[in-house]
Amino acid sequence: MKKLFLLLAMLVALCSGVAGNISGWEAVPFIGMPKAYAFETKPVNFVVIDRTGSVTKADMRGWIQMVKMDYHVPYYGLMDDNTKAIAAVNDMFAKNPKPDKEAMKAAAEQAGCGALVVMVVHRMESYMVHSYGPFDDEIYVRTFAYADMFAYNSDGNKFIRRFLRETDFEPAGQDENPSDTIKWTLGNLLNKMEGKPQI
């Protein structure tokens, strides 16, 4: 009972300030306790221009996953509001349909972001083709994945671009979804720019 009373008395003394000023000890970490560090989180904008009208939310989720793989918390934060970035990208494409490093840098500065990833989807479709040969009754799938990809990172003044034009013709079941083709190409492109291994 005495130990409990003594413990309560110490807690009251510490909480009420009777034990003295401990503000000088706040900056001293306890042994074994981790120290918190503040990171500067750079904003990242990912702008997709859909020229096909067929980009779905599932497609966007897959592509955003690739962007987040290279530009992740705590160093980068993907912005939810793309209003300024879309305006900057539209201005950029009005001046130059195939932007270079300086155009992307200017667009990133106008958008107020540390990294800017832009993708223009021109064609993304697949359809089945039936074989009518006498000895071939296979069903094939023809796929089209056409997209222009641009990326700029102010950290290191890095820039990369790629004009993807992939057409494939495979037996049904062995074909790759055009959205996935674009997804993996985008991921590898960003990894290449950031010096990371290919997927």
Residue ranges, per PLM feature:
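Extracytoplasmic/secreted cell-surface and envelope-processing proteins
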Residues: 126-132
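N-terminal segment of the mature soluble domain
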Residues: 39-122, 156-162, 189-196
